[in-house]
């Protein structure tokens, strides 16, 4: 089957889900454009900052869309592309997007409280403690895994027979590391300029794109060749800064710039499908059991998580995005819209 047809069908389903089901939820839940959001009522210039809806969308999408929707869809394809596609579409429209939208809605309607405080309010202190303990343990695992992966990716050295030397990919790895560091630096510059200029629309996009291009252009020509240990320290230093700096200074501009990379990746994939018209070479269905991976249930639903439904997204919706929503009407595109776009990304990875 032509993969372009698969992507078009998926896109139509996801757009329809956003337009009809997402809008129905917004109406059913009582989204009020005239209501004062926590970002407006509690504006402190740190965590609670009224922000343009598309900027919040960029933050939400960049925060939830990482390697998960890409690698998950590819890994689950051992069961065939049809069950993976069906789960991405059904899960994304009726589970994932609803979860993200619902968490965002609940937080905005409750003074911007994070998920832990919401659980304390509606379930009790024991529920809150259990949830926060789980989040703490989960975060430790994720941070440790990703820090090691990132440091390993940027590492310029390799050890062969007990001898440490520069690897053949030292320059490439160093350039990738430089781009990442400069990306953070330019994100701060972007945040400072945006704070002063208050640009919106195309002006904000041009400024963000210019900072993104500058980070790539300089980083590719000035590789930082260093060890994995050094990169590990740098990664944890960045994690600390991201945790303590105001939203508008680092996280929001960083995610806004990251969206350009995701958009470029999606656009490139679509252009490739339109030009090449590749056929789906994977079998439609290989059976309920796979010798290497196990049974379709629960493996399919474990591997395709971020592309269909992920509880982690609720931490983003209630932890950061809810505190920057300037108008309740933006909640649908931020909560529901970012998730269905991630589902489309998963479909592209599958194709």
PLM features: residue spans?
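Membrane-interface "cap" regions at the ends of multi-pass membrane proteins
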Residues: 16-70, 295, 299
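Hydrophobic alpha-helical segments and their helix-loop junctions in multi-pass secondary transporters
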Residues: 191-195, 210-233, 242-243, 263-287
